[in-house]
Amino acid sequence: EPKENFTMEQLLWKGKMNFSYKYDYSAAGVRRSVEDSLQRLGLSSIDVVFIHDLSPDNGDMKDSYASYFEQAVKGAMPELSKMREEGLIKGWGLGVNTIEPILQTLDVADPDIFLSACQYSLIKHDDDLNTVFPKIAERGMSIFVGAPLCAGFLSGKNRYLYDGTFPEGVKEKLSALKRVADHHSVDLRTAALQFAASPDEVSGVIPGAHTAEQAVQNAHSFHAKIPADFWEELKHEKLIALHAPVPKV
């Protein structure tokens, strides 16, 4: 398949390997990671590289997040920009579960895109909506939304995100969302995916899927019709922000 016919993204992350690992956000480390990936993939370039989990919620980093971020500012970030100029990659950014690294990176580097996970969903969206999206818009950038279903919480799984806990109020909010969805005969998973894709700043949504059937269902959800009254009731009940973008009917 000719390279121009598909998009290839790459995460700088530990993955699952049969040997130990360490976080290396130096210039040499990031270049080695990208060049090794190009060799394994048999490609001459990668469209997007995300620095993954460079975030204060990363338990591996313990209290050393600031030093890891500083290493990336001096090493990985300028090196990725250099590789962009060389044509090895087309763009780079961060893939993180919190907004702080995104805001910090916007202040010190020239990224192209971000993957913001766990921050924009029917359950929780204020931080991305009010803080991240305006800054993204100012720079003419875009963002991918990760975990729009809150790791399955909005599609029937008995878990909220990834740490095994249920923050205060999330179960009650889910019940309220289900009540409105049932009233309008709307599939809540479908509504959650369309909600995540609605802001102009969002260029992609990444829902998880365990099976091919789930992947197909997710794709179909983006084309389903949802009545405007459903979104109006969510706003009336203060289940989503009044200024949150919703799908155009």
Question: What is each stretch, according to the model?
Answer:
Residues 1-2, 56:
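A short acidic, glycine/proline-enriched capping/turn motif at secondary-structure boundaries
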Residues 2-12, 159-160:
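Short, flexible, mixed-charge acidic loops at enzyme active sites
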Residues 9-15, 166, 170:
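Active-site gating loops and adjacent loop-to-helix segments of metal-dependent hydrolytic enzymes
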Residues 15-31, 65:
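Active-site mouth loops of central-metabolism enzymes
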Residues 26-40, 97-104:
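Short, acidic/polar
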Residues 30-47, 129-142:
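Short amphipathic alpha-helices and their capping/turn segments at secondary-structure boundaries
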Residues 38-62:
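Active-site groove signature of glycoside hydrolases
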Residues 54-236, 240-241, 246-248:
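Beta/alpha (TIM)-barrel catalytic core signal, keyed to glycine-rich beta->alpha loops juxtaposed to Asp/Glu
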